[in-house]
Design a protein with these regions (language model features):
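Conserved N-terminal beta1-alpha1 strand-loop-helix module at the mouth
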Residues: 1-142
């Protein structure tokens, strides 16, 4: 198994510069694009500034909760390598993947072990799976 690391919720240029210039940066750096309930949500104006920072050896990830066409169009020219999608059906994910030519991280919300098996629905559309707890903005744990 190949393990990858991701830091998510980056919203400050100073912190992002530190991360990308670290001797051992994470493979993925996530930016919460369209979920204002999260205290780590990044306003689009700040996001544009963050995207000016060279990612070097990391991949930039747009974290999106059931994104609408407006937000997808607004970020399409930004240098994201992956879109991490929450609360999307496989058909919507496939459509986003084809239209925007991005790799996809499908986030599967886990309440219990049955939810883990949901990954099977996304086999055709997903490049990476991320299993996350319910309550995105609350950083809740799960068994």
């Amino acid at each position: 198994m190949i393990l990858k690391s991701k830091i998510c919720g980056v919203s400050d240029t100073k912190i992002l510069n530190f991360i990308v210039n670290h001797d051992h940066p994470p493979q993925f750096i996530g930016f919460i694009v369209n979920y204002p309930k999260s205290k780590r949500h990044v306003d689009i104006k700040i996001l544009k500034e963050l995207m000016k920072i060279e990612k070097k050896n990391s991949f930039y990830v747009a974290v999106l909760v059931n994104p609408n066409q407006n937000i997808l169009e607004e970020i399409k020219e930004m240098p994201f390598d992956y879109y991490q999608l929450y609360d999307c059906q496989p058909s919507k994910i496939q459509s986003i993947k084809e239209k925007y030519k991005k790799k996809i991280i499908t986030a599967i919300t886990v309440r219990d072990i049955k939810d883990v098996n949901d990954y099977r629905k996304f086999i055709e559309t997903t490049d990476i799976y991320l299993f996350d707890s319910k309550g995105y903005e609350n950083s809740m744990s799960f068994d």
